[in-house]
Design a protein with these regions (language model features):
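Interfacial catalytic loop of ABC nucleotide-binding domains
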Residues: 93-96, 141, 157-159
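Short coil-to-helix segment of the ABC ATPase nucleotide-binding domain corresponding to the Q-loop/switch region
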Residues: 118-126, 159
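Conserved ABC ATPase "signature" region
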Residues: 23-31, 88-89, 130-133, 137-155
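Helix-to-loop junction immediately C-terminal to a conserved catalytic motif
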Residues: 73
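The feature captures the beta-strand-to-loop junction immediately N-terminal to the Walker
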Residues: 58-60
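ABC nucleotide-binding domain "signature motif"
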Residues: 79-89
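ABC ATPase NBD coupling module
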Residues: 32-36, 90-107, 136
């Protein structure tokens, strides 16, 4: 079972985007959308991510990468499509369940992220777990697992440059 499954995700920005999209039967007519003042942010994205996979979303500036990720986290609502996290229909979750899922199963690293310069690599990785209430030892142990997973062993005591 995939950890993340996206099936035919569309995001169209603009007035009456949902209504205009439904009238196209999924066949995006860019001219009609432009005439209606709409912009396509994500056009029929479908993929699966399985445990242990690494997925890279690449594209030019403005091509919809961040919009797709915002749809997956439901920070932006998709115009159409289905999104599943661990088999759970993300679009059917209550606000409370969505908050719980965001806290425990997903996170975003922003393009202009900042490391805490007074903390080591290991401490920077452990910090969010401590904020969530994990003990120092548990968070350090989990952070060390991540250090090993991404090949930073031997650098865990370094400070950011």
């Amino acid at each position: 079972m995939p950890v993340i499954k996206c099936d035919s995700i569309y995001k169209i920005f603009g007035h009456n985007a949902q209504k205009i999209f439904q009238s196209t039967d999924g066949a995006i007519d860019t001219d009609a959308l432009q005439q209606a003042g709409c912009v396509v942010g994500v056009n029929n994205a479908s993929f699966e991510v399985h445990k242990g996979d690494l997925l890279v979303v690449m594209g030019l500036s403005g091509s919809g990468k961040s919009t797709l990720l915002r749809c997956i986290s439901r920070l932006t609502e998709a115009t159409a499509g289905k999104i599943y996290i661990d088999g759970e229909d993300l679009l059917a979750l209550s606000e409370k369940k969505l908050i719980e899922l965001r806290r425990n199963k997903m996170g975003m690293v922003f393009q202009s992220f900042a490391l805490l310069p007074h903390k080591t690599v290991l401490e920077n990785i452990a910090f969010p777990l401590q904020v969530k209430g994990a003990s120092t030892q548990d968070s350090i142990n989990r952070a060390m697992e991540m250090v090993l997973l991404v090949g930073l062993n031997g650098r865990e005591n370094n400070f950011p440059r």
